[in-house]
Design a protein with these regions (language model features):
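Short alpha-helical transmembrane segments in multi-pass integral membrane proteins
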Residues: 1-12, 73-140, 186-246, 302-367, ...
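N-terminal transmembrane alpha-helices
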Residues: 3-31, 35-39, 52-68, 72, ...
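Transmembrane helical elements of multi-pass membrane transporters/channels
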Residues: 10-30, 134, 167-168, 201-205, ...
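Transmembrane alpha-helix boundary and packing residues in multipass membrane permease domains
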Residues: 15, 19, 31, 71, ...
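Helix-terminus/linker motif at the lipid-water interface of multi-pass membrane proteins
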Residues: 20, 24-46, 115-122, 178-189, ...
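Short runs within selected transmembrane alpha-helices of multi-pass transporters and secretion channels
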Residues: 63-66, 135-154, 161-169, 194-210, ...
Length: 473
């Protein structure tokens, strides 16, 4: 194995390991909520789900703090410019503090709007609101950790990023169990303890990152004096940085539109297809936990080699990262092809749900190649700080997602609804444009899967076409 492949694995494997722990937090929180005494399990689990969705809506909009910091830091690192590396860090921290303050100030208006957009029961809304109003106080830590994550990636330091995630997720799991369920003779705090556990975990992660910077990066960060921060935040220096982050913000909003639109559309299809859509998305996102590790490696190496003006190594790193990413895609195609039904049985013990989901297994075989390509290109373009193609690809992907869904719905569901063959053989018009009985009753979710595939394909094709605009940087 050559040195570049070793470098890719050094950067990717810690990220993959950290990513694998992410779903464990949600599983544990759900399990704790489902076993609380004095609270109906369905209400508590539903409140965790709704509350988590509130924070996804909120924090995903600020993911540009991570993505914008990573590429810039990697380029400064590659150029050997320690002062620029430090300036990017402190500017990111200042912006994170400002964003966190804004989030805390707007927590009540945001919550009111978010609750209005849900169709949950009053009991679920009340618990979800309680969860939100506790967990929101982790905002300063959570938003700062986004900047730390990007900066560590740019510094080619995936180990610190991994340990940060392991600390956050590990503390979250332990704290939520203890605070929610209690320990020994102490009964715990109940539902509020789950939210408080997340708050404690985020601040533990922040403390860990501060210690890492003091021990490992004190000299690097000392290359930039805090007295110079005003100049770094001036209009002349902040302008290009904010334009790039503005593009990345629009990218985040477009992606959020797809990943919020998918479950919202699925809620119109009835309980069985809604359950199938949730299972399919979990399996579709599973391979992204692995691919993202190589996307982060691509981001770090592309930025570093661009900063070092080493175009040959930059192109080689992109080629090798894609080989690793496509290997992940092929592995998951094999897993879904050979073990699709057993994998479904791991997620649900309901035979009816397993049988219904099996109709959508072909999508699990089609998605990995185009999905892995889209995610890997994201890392490459982030490393090159080419925010405009990233913005455009996601905006058009969102348009494609909605366009494909509504066109297919209009052509086959809303108008010209199929007929239903009755027991006597007589043909009756189907009164429902959404839930179609009979052998083609799965069409709505198939159409939604087509729309999701189209969104990934647009991202892949768009960025593939734009590769020539950055390969000679």
């Amino acid at each position: 194995m050559n040195s570049l492949n070793k470098e890719i694995l050094r950067l990717a494997l810690p990220s993959i390991l950290a990513n694998i722990t992410v779903p464990l937090v949600g599983i544990v929180d759900t399990a704790v909520a489902g076993h609380l005494t004095g609270t109906e399990a369905a209400v508590a689990i539903g409140a965790i789900s709704v509350g988590a969705m509130f924070f996804s809506l909120l924090y995903w909009n600020f993911s540009f703090l991570r993505t914008g910091t990573g590429g810039l830091t990697a380029q400064a690192y590659g150029a050997g410019d320690q002062r620029e590396v430090a300036k990017i860090f402190w500017r990111g921290m200042a912006l994170s503090a400002a964003v966190a303050l804004l989030v805390l100030l707007l927590q009540w208006p945001f919550l009111k709007v978010a609750v209005l957009c849900t169709q949950a029961s009053p009991e679920v809304e009340a618990l979800a609101s309680q969860y939100f109003l506790i967990r929101i106080w982790a905002a300063p830590a959570t938003i700062s950790l986004m900047t730390f994550s990007g900066w560590f990636v740019g510094m080619q330091d995936s180990m610190s990023s991994m340990w940060k995630d392991l600390v956050v997720n590990g503390v979250n799991i332990v704290a939520s169990i203890i605070l929610g369920r209690g320990i020994g003779s102490w009964p715990g705090l109940g539902f509020a303890g789950i939210a408080l556990g997340t708050v404690i975990a985020q601040y533990c992660g922040l403390l860990f990152c501060i210690v890492v910077c003091l021990v490992k990066y004190r000299r690097v960060l000392g290359a930039f004096r805090l007295s110079e921060l005003r100049q770094a935040l001036s209009r002349s220096e902040l302008g290009p940085y904010m334009r790039m982050n503005g593009n990345l913000f629009l990218r985040s909003v477009s992606m959020l539109g797809v990943y919020i639109g998918y479950p919202l559309i699925a809620t119109t299809m009835g309980d069985m297809l809604l359950a199938c859509s949730a299972v399919m998305m979990q399996l579709l996102m599973l391979f992204s936990y692995f691919t993202d590790g190589f996307a982060y490696a691509g981001e770090a190496l592309v930025g570093r080699f661009i900063g070092a003006r080493d175009n040959v190594s930059m192109r080689r790193s992109v080629r090798y990262v894609f080989i690793w990413s496509m290997s992940i895609a092929l592995a998951f195609i094999g897993i879904y092809w050979v073990g699709g039904v057993p994998v479904l049985r791991l997620l649900t013990s309901d035979p009816a749900v397993v049988q219904a989901c099996s109709a959508f297994l072909p999508w699990l075989i089609l998605m990995p190649p185009v999905g892995c390509a889209a995610f890997t290109w994201d890392g490459v373009f982030l490393g090159a700080t080419a925010s405009r193609p990233l913005r455009d690809s996601c905006v058009w992907a969102f348009v494609a997602f909605l366009g494909v869904w509504f066109v297919l719905r209009w052509l086959f569901l809303d108008s010209g609804t199929p007929d239903v063959v009755g027991d006597s053989g007589a043909v009756f018009p189907d009164p429902s444009p959404t839930v179609i009985p009979g052998p083609i009753g799965n069409l709505p979710l198939h159409f939604l899967m087509v729309a999701y595939f189209a969104h990934l394909a647009v991202r892949t094709v768009w960025l593939s076409a734009k590769w020539k605009s950055i390969r000679d940087l």
